Amino acid sequence: MNEITCISPINGEIFAKRNTLSLKVAQEKVQLLRAAQKAWSARPLAERISLVMEGVDAVGKMNDQIVPELAQMMGRPIRYGGEFGGFKERAQYMSEIAEEALQDIEISNDSSFKRYIRRIPHGLVFVVAPWNY
C-alpha cells in the first residue's frame, strides 16, 4: 500500500502520513457514495440545507484547531487563517438563494407544450481542490 506524506514547509518535518486505497477498495467506496448521493438527493431541499449548515457550524467550532494545522501544513502564518468566516458567509448565502435558484426555468409559455430547464443533481463528483493561499 502506498502512502501520501505531507511535509511541512516550515521545518521540513513530516506533518502527516495517510495510506492510499487500493483500486478495488476505492471502487467499492465510490459505489457506496453513489448510493448515498441518491438518498441525499431524495431528501427535501430544506432538510439538505439544514444539514449542510450544521456541518458548516461544526467546521466553525473547529476553527481554533484547524487554523494552526493548516498553517503547519502550508507554511503560512496563522494570522492569515481567516478562511472560515468567508466559508460560512458563502455557505449562508448559497443556502438563502438555493430554493429560488434551483426552481425550474420556464423557456416559453406556449400552451401547446411546456419548455423548461430543470436543474438536477449531477450525482457523485470527485474533486481534488487546491488550497489557494
Task: Set out the residue ranges of the language-model regions.
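Conserved small-residue-rich beta-alpha loop and adjacent elements
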Residues: E106-Y133
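N-terminal Rossmann-like NAD(P)+-binding subdomain of aldehyde/semialdehyde dehydrogenases
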Residues: M1-K114
